[in-house]
Amino acid sequence: MSAKEIFFDVKAREKLSRGVDKLANAVKVTLGPKGRNVAIEKSFGAPVITKDGVTVAKEIELSDKFENMGAQLVKEVASKTSDAAGDGTTTATILAQAIYREGVKLVAAGRNPMAIKRGIDKAVEGLITELANLAKPTRDQKEIAQIGTISANSDTTIGNIIAEAMAKVGKEGVITVEEAKGLETTMDVVEGMRFDRGYLSPYFVTNPEKMVCEMDNPYILCTEKKISSMKDMLPVLEQVAKVNRPLMIIAEDVEGEALATLVVNKLRGALQVVAVKAPGFGDRRKAMLQDIAVLTGGQVASDDTGSKLENMTLAELGTAKRIVIDKENTTVVDGAGKSEDIKARVKQIRAQIEDSTSDYDREKLQERLAKLVGGVAVVHVGAATEVEMKEKKDRVEDALNATRAAVEEGIVPGGGTALIRVAKVLCDIKPADDDELAGVNIIRRAIEEPLRQIALNAGFEGSIVVEKVREGKDGFGFNAATGEYEDLIKAGVIDPKKVTRTALQNAASVASLLLTTECAIAEKPEPKKDAAMPDMGGMGGMGGMGGMY
């Protein structure tokens, strides 16, 4: 086990504080509409240019291990805020720095850090309650566009595209972000259910120009089994051929004799048919097949239900108004499932989302939910260069997360104003002693810091701006984009309440942990060994040079 280096008390907090400041100072230059970019060197390829706080924070690793501890803890604030609310990472970092900076001074002066922490916790609790009172629900598409615009660094195009996507697919719908082939940023909405499996053979194509298979009013057969023999499928195929309607087969796989027979019948015109693989894997595949069956009003041929493929009737097959299948995707439009069955399935998936502890599982369940109720919108981000593409994609994702947060918990005045407005509640808090009061006062000063930094980045004196905003009421605040003092809600400068709340909670939590840290331990750096002198053995013949001066 390698030797450890240990610092206590003032020395430990001083080292941690230096790391906190280095990370926070790099992140906070990005805050606000006039925030600056940060260039990040990459070991390969072009440097990344970004104005996204969490991207900057994640890149920072300090050489001093004690300073790095402080930086990593504040990085945790940014990451946790990004995970929970999708935005507000820079605000959270600034708040954490301000709370810790103020707290360290008081602890150094002899205050009790545990009592200070209790004061901080009481203050944050009061502010969060008041934020809920200040928040207003999002009323229309215009407000959603404004939130998206602010989160995308005042890019109205991105804001409008996100608002349009949310209007089309609804609150439950899935919006994904992909790279476009051209310069334009566009949005497509997929109607109905789409899953990422295409036709098993190009011979199933009905539109050779577009290389897609299109069918109107088809039957849909779902089975979780692999189909390799024709005899299992024959009874169903005969029934479908009699009524002269198209058939889509969704199975684990269709291969060998079964696939060859389907292709031959399709080419001869005896049967309009297409086969695709079932989406997902394992238990998730079973669940997704059941979703398709519910949506189309059919049943899944499965051992679990005792339903065998060879015994299936037309009544057990699903139907849809239309299906479109290309090489990679299948889209089922307007399935014929009963609305009460779909509602019951949606309710079941929502319950699973509530119970899920895995982020990955929750994300997959939400995708399934969206396919059943809302649909899927795809935002294609276009840019001239790869560097610009990455930066723009980050901004689109930020805007998307912010708008979702706004729909969830409502909106508050933006530009750091909401925290100034709720500060009045701190006067009602009754601390148990002077040290707790000191904790409340730390929060009172720290919540001014985001507005101060926004003003500073825009070229204004922070203290003057804070004082002017404090004198106003309700939505009155400082619009850094124009340099004007106005009603920010009317001007469209709004923040999701969830983002402000999460930033404050996470910042206070980590800053309190740092304040109550009395000892820091890290591995001792190994001393550098002096380079060995080269062997001089081969120079023995120089003895005859003694006459030289």
UniProtKB/Swiss-Prot annotation:
CDD domains: GroEL (cd03344)
GO cellular component term of the entry, any: cytoplasm
Compartments where located: Cytoplasm
Major location (coarse): cytoplasm
Subunit structure of this chain's protein: Forms a cylinder of 14 subunits composed of two heptameric rings stacked back-to-back. Interacts with the co-chaperonin GroES.
MF annotations from Gene Ontology: ATP binding; ATP-dependent protein folding chaperone; isomerase activity; unfolded protein binding
EC numbers, comma separated: 5.6.1.7
Family, as annotated: Belongs to the chaperonin (HSP60) family.
Primary role: Together with its co-chaperonin GroES, plays an essential role in assisting protein folding. The GroEL-GroES system forms a nano-cage that allows encapsulation of the non-native substrate proteins and provides a physical environment optimized to promote and accelerate protein folding.
HAMAP family from the UniProt entry: CH60
Residues that coordinate or bind ATP: 30-33, 51, 87-91, 415, 479-481, 495
Domain of life where this protein originates: Bacteria
Coiled coil, from the record: none
GO biological process, one term: protein refolding
Catalytic activity: ATP + H2O + a folded polypeptide = ADP + phosphate + an unfolded polypeptide
Name the record gives this protein: Chaperonin GroEL
Sorted UniProt keywords: ATP-binding, Chaperone, Cytoplasm, Isomerase, Nucleotide-binding
